[in-house]
């Protein structure tokens, strides 16, 4: 059964510096060292209109379309998630691949299925994400589904045909 515990406060100081390190690695053209599991998402700020960047874990892929799935660990209040809802055109860099695409928030059912598929593949990362987000789980497939459905929205980014 999913339960909510007090979430950790937003990262500041040296923790923020560590959390933002992958973005800096991409800026130094060292992003491929992170592999394909961490991507750099460039999106447009909803109020400033300026480019914003965040490094996120690729939680899944759709080989048929080339789409990637990303999880908004801090829910729909995450700045990047709110920005892509306003302007869905994004740029993604994953490994050496650089492409433009369109972001689409997945439905709660799709998010639930994505979380239930992700958690068994990366159990330690999933448990760490739950702790950071202030959620607990019994580890069952149904509980992971419920977490994705109720708390962690996922996003699908489909490459533009001309950049594949």
What label would you give each PLM region?
Residues 2-38, 124-150:
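Alpha-helical membrane-targeting segments
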Residues 29-31, 60, 68-82:
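Covalent nucleotidyltransferase core used to form phosphodiester bonds in nucleic acids
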Residues 147, 152-164:
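A hydrophobic membrane-anchoring alpha-helix module
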Residues 75-138, 142, 149-151:
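Short, structured beta-strand-loop surface elements
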Residues 1-16, 40-50, 101-114:
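N-terminal short leaders/motifs
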Residues 43-48, 92-94, 159-163:
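Short acidic, glycine-rich loop/turn motifs
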Residues 36-73:
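Short beta-strand segments
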């Amino acid at each position: 059964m999913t339960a909510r515990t007090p979430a950790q406060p937003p990262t500041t100081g040296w923790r923020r510096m560590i959390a933002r390190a992958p973005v800096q690695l991409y800026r130094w053209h060292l992003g491929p060292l992170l592999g394909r599991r961490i991507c750099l998402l460039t999106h447009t700020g909803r109020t400033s209109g300026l480019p914003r960047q965040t490094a996120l874990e690729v939680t899944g892929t759709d080989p048929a379309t080339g789409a990637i799935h990303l999880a908004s660990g801090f829910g729909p209040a995450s700045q990047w998630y709110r920005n892509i809802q306003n302007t869905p055109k994004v740029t993604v860099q994953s490994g050496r691949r650089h492409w433009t695409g369109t972001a689409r928030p997945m439905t709660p059912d799709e998010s639930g299925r994505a979380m239930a598929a992700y958690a068994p593949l990366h159990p330690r990362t999933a448990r760490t994400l739950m702790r950071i987000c202030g959620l607990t789980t019994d580890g069952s497939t149904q509980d992971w589904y419920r977490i994705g459905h109720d708390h962690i929205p996922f996003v699908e980014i489909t490459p533009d045909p001309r950049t594949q």
